[in-house]
């Protein structure tokens, strides 16, 4: 439909202030280095507040005590969130031990937060510890460059322990894509690692002086698992194998979930199929997609700046043709692929070379020593003896990967002793939330702190209707920016106000359909009342193997979203 009325390739008009900031920043330096030495405030001032995002950090404060501090005439309790760049979520046990120590010694909350972007975050880093965290990461071969703001963010890769050989190849491509699309500015090394300034002019051959119009997310996905939720991402490489070997990728472009409440110019969108490419064209095509979005993306309105809106404005075929022109290739027809699920298989799975992989369920990805549940200590003890690696999944879980038969019993014993293998029901395994309160400045309603007890109540509803071992893919996100990926869930809750959510129904288990808003601005008891009725019908009327989301569509409870740019809000 979008091909019939293509819009302008470049949106004319007054540029946003973010564009001015990027030009003025001297390739992302700003005055961050000077600001670090200002002890009068715990935060970063002016442009630096936003510029630190390009260096992988967000300035936050503890919203639980914001009003109390204001009464005391104190500034908010500023602290930084730092997000590591970790393509494919792979981290060595040596690196894990370093981040465990930093979290314990130098953050307010003492936790490691696994995210659905397949990396980890530190919350609560005081300004005095900001430079040390970057130096600690560098000392173990990690960094936080380009994990936030208008760049290609952390590249995801299916954490598939079944296809170990294919995973190894796909993971290498995730790393290559991440490295290829990194900014070239030396600002990160100069500010955080004390590297000397070089008397040359910075050049950004791919990203340009003003970087991208908005955040940009990339995945490498191995069917039939859609664990990385490709339709939440701008650019997706779907692995195509022949005889167990990776031969190329299907490219899908223009997914994204972020919306604004009540703004009908915003919508969630699934990614569009562009075609198949052999492996040798991967980096050229990745660069071509990014530079096309760089040049054509809307820099006059950040709420309309993501790749999904560019595709709808110029037309999918026009965008695709430009990618072909820039990359010097012609897309081949899409090769057959299918997604059957996206959850992690909790427990032991045998891979190649007689190595085992243990997937541990980590509720909400929050790793901390709780009373009677010493999760953080348990993982540290495993890291001390495990010779393989850890893999963070896009479902916020953790895989102890590459365990030899001789170590299996020892690692399982440690996991069990530290409550890391306490069994949970399928509903809890298939539920996810973003961080939200108390640290996220955008939060409108609780998410991470709300989900565990809400899941208890959903489990009770399933049990009441005789299906205690069933599950609904359930996501809670504290605001419509959508970090919790609620707009690809069978049941998605989007925070509207404290204690109130918009309820979306009609996604599916494989994550290929956007759910539609079913009820607006309702409370937890109202959500559970609705769910009681809907689950009762699902239990009685469903067809064999029919998931909750598919049932709500087939039964006419909700209309499917078929063309989001036009029917998402209907």
Swiss-Prot record:
| Pathway the protein acts in | Sulfur metabolism; hydrogen sulfide biosynthesis; hydrogen sulfide from sulfite (NADPH route): step 1/1
Name the cofactor(s): siroheme; [4Fe-4S] cluster
Which reactions are catalysed by this chain? hydrogen sulfide + 3 NADP(+) + 3 H2O = sulfite + 3 NADPH + 4 H(+)
Sites where the protein binds siroheme? 483
Q: State the InterPro entries in the record.
A: CysI (IPR011786), NiRdtase/SiRdtase_haem-b_fer (IPR005117), Nit/Sulf_reduc_fer-like_dom_sf (IPR036136), NO2/SO3_Rdtase_4Fe4S_dom (IPR006067), NO2/SO3_Rdtase_4Fe4S_prot (IPR045169), NO2/SO3_Rdtase_4Fe4S_sf (IPR045854), NO2/SO3_Rdtase_FeS/sirohaem_BS (IPR006066)
Sorted alphabetically, the Gene Ontology BP terms of this entry are:
cysteine biosynthetic process; hydrogen sulfide biosynthetic process; sulfate assimilation
- Asked if the record carries the keyword Iron-sulfur, the reply is yes
Q: Which residues bind [4Fe-4S] cluster?
A: 434, 440, 479, 483
Q: Name one GO cellular component term.
A: sulfite reductase complex (NADPH)
**Among its keywords, does the record have Isomerase?**
no
Q: Which GO terms describe its molecular function?
A: 4 iron, 4 sulfur cluster binding; heme binding; metal ion binding; NADP binding; sulfite reductase (ferredoxin) activity; sulfite reductase (NADPH) activity
Binding note for cofactor = Binds 1 siroheme per subunit.
Keywords of this entry: 4Fe-4S, Amino-acid biosynthesis, Cysteine biosynthesis, Heme, Iron, Iron-sulfur, Metal-binding, NADP, Oxidoreductase
Gene3D superfamilies according to UniProt: Sulfite Reductase Hemoprotein, domain 1
Q: EC number(s) of the enzyme?
A: 1.8.1.2
Q: How does it assemble?
A: Alpha(8)-beta(8). The alpha component is a flavoprotein, the beta component is a hemoprotein.
Similarity field: Belongs to the nitrite and sulfite reductase 4Fe-4S domain family.
What is the protein's known function? Component of the sulfite reductase complex that catalyzes the 6-electron reduction of sulfite to sulfide. This is one of several activities required for the biosynthesis of L-cysteine from sulfate.
NCBIfam families associated with the record: CysI (TIGR02041), PRK13504.1 (NF010029)
Protein name, per record:
Sulfite reductase [NADPH] hemoprotein beta-component
Native organism is Enterobacter sp. (strain 638)
From the broadest rank down, the organism's phylogenetic lineage runs: Bacteria, Pseudomonadati, Pseudomonadota, Gammaproteobacteria, Enterobacterales
Q: Which gene encodes it?
A: cysI
